[in-house]
Each structure stands twice: as C-alpha cells, then as structure tokens.
Amino acid sequence: MGSGAIRRRLALGAAVLAAAGTLALTATGTAQAASGGCAGREVRTLPFKTGVTHVYKRDGYVCAVTVPRTPGPARTMSVSVQARGNRPVVDRGRYNRLAGPVTVHAGHRCVWIKGAVGRDSVSSGWILC
C-alpha cells in the first residue's frame, strides 16, 4: 500500500472520529438542555396552561425547572421546591427559556413543587414521600 493510500485512510479515520465526537457532544448538550441543568432522573412532569415544571431526583436531592410551552420574549417565570419542614427555595424572574434549576436536599422527606409562567401556575401538593 502506498503512502498516499495510508494518508487517505488516516484522514478518513480522523474524520470519522471527529464526527463521532461531535455527535456525542451534541447528544449530551441536548440531554442537558432537556433537564435544564438538573441531575438525576425525571420523576414528575407537572403541566399547566402556559408551561411545564419538570422534577428530577438523585441521591436524596430534588431538582426542578419550569419551561414555557412556547418560546418568546422574556416573561415572569418561577420554580419553587420545598422539602417538608424547610422553607421553599425559589427562583423567580423574567426569563425567556426557563426558571431554575432549583435543588434541595430532601432525603426521604416529601417535597412541594410550584411552577409558574406568566399568570398560570401549578402546585404539586406534597409528593415523593
């Protein structure tokens, strides 16, 4: 095999590795965007008229993000997580993509999740007990 053929095969191999790496990074970024920065597995989805609050759990920690149903300009959004016996941890402001993530250590305690986009909201009651 000539040196030209070897160079072509090396170039092809490098291109395949680069493409595979790019796909892996894209998939990771997509998963990160879907979770809004929360670690763990999704355990609840709390839909409401103008958005959805996603709840994740891992190793005793509970995390939540609120995402609007439709993209658009910045608007008032919030997400709140309260472990039973503690004060709620809240992220409230004007965002265009999501509110949160908000993470609390719940251990084996129940949590109360709230989310809002504009005037519409959701409140879970005590869950994950």
Q: For the regions a protein language model found, what residue spans apply to each?
A:
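Secretory targeting and sorting signals
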Residues: M1-A33
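Post-signal peptide N-terminal regions of Sec-secreted extracellular proteins
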Residues: Q32-C129
